[in-house]
Amino acid sequence: MIKLLYPKFWQKQNIIAYLLLPVSLIYQFLGYLRASLAQPIMLPAKVICVGNCSVGGTGKTQIVIYLAKLLKARNVSFVIVTKGYGSKLKNAAIVNARHTVLEVGDEGVILVKYGLVIATKNIKEALPLINELKPDVIIVDDFLQNPHFHKDFTIVSVDSQRLFGNGFLIPAGPLRQYPNKALDAADLVFLVSSTNDKMLNILTPYVNKLINAQIVPLNNIDKTKNYFAFSGIGNPERFFSTLKNYGLNIVGYKIFPDHYNYLQADLENLYSLAKEHNNATLITTRKDYVKFHDLNNNIVCLDVELSINNPNLLNEKIFKKAQIFN
């Protein structure tokens, strides 16, 4: 898998983005061709698909966790299907607590705490396992742009800091598909992190299906210490903002590519950087923390959860449309 940092030209239109537009047109055509030729299959349960229209972290994992807790509280059987990003996964697998990130991906290792999880590169390859588990609901983490299976309910996650970047498709911009298409088709739109008038104006046409959500810390962390933050996720800036908003003294930070698999040498380098910054304590995300399974470390992990301002809208939309819930 190619691992990239979020390039600066994805956020604002400039000469590099314009030079890459012809390649974006090819990407758009291939996506159209793929969708036109696809024959969507029906999965053996109701499908809730959580995705985004842009590259990078938009809070999808936290939304999936929120849904898992919601369904569990209603005694609805479900399975989570995730792509296994950053893993060496070859065949679809039911995730267990002994699996590592290299085997099933960071999302799989995190999500297994909240319910049954299948890690797969191809949704069709997961079918035998889904049939074996017989869930009432399938929560699909990502796969939003995959036209090969029917989706009963779609949730599009939008990060309020980056929004839609420069508005161009990959590789000229961060978009997997144009926002209007994704948002028009969505049953719910999650706006994750802080909001402002500009964002709300852009999303005004979708106000009847808009969920405002915040990423909030779960654990108590010593605020008297200095911290050196590092992260290899899709949107590290949001993580750093969360740390500062929480009142932590961040004296330095280092960004790694998304879904980065750390080596012992990386850990040693991070310890050196922390020492150079007033003997700071290392702090990172849960997605990064789970990758240090085999490495000795003394790292603080910031655990977070999703807090939404209008849960009644979420409940009403999902339970009313799905029609299978108790």
UniProtKB/Swiss-Prot annotation:
Question: Which pathway does it take part in?
Answer: Glycolipid biosynthesis; lipid IV(A) biosynthesis; lipid IV(A) from (3R)-3-hydroxytetradecanoyl-[acyl-carrier-protein] and UDP-N-acetyl-alpha-D-glucosamine: step 6/6
**What GO CC annotations are associated with the protein?**
plasma membrane
Q: What class of enzyme is it?
A: transferase
Alphabetized UniProt keyword annotations: ATP-binding, Kinase, Lipid A biosynthesis, Lipid biosynthesis, Lipid metabolism, Nucleotide-binding, Transferase
The answer on whether this UniProt entry bears the keyword Nuclease reads no
On whether ATP-binding is a keyword of this UniProt record, the answer is yes
- Note the InterPro entries from the entry: LpxK, P-loop_NTPase
Sites binding ATP sit at S54, V55, G56, G57, T58, G59, K60, T61
Q: Which PANTHER family match?
A: TETRAACYLDISACCHARIDE 4'-KINASE, TETRAACYLDISACCHARIDE 4'-KINASE, MITOCHONDRIAL-RELATED
The task this protein performs is described as: Transfers the gamma-phosphate of ATP to the 4'-position of a tetraacyldisaccharide 1-phosphate intermediate (termed DS-1-P) to form tetraacyldisaccharide 1,4'-bis-phosphate (lipid IVA).
Q: Which family does it belong to?
A: Belongs to the LpxK family.
Q: What is this protein called?
A: Tetraacyldisaccharide 4'-kinase
Q: Which gene encodes it?
A: lpxK
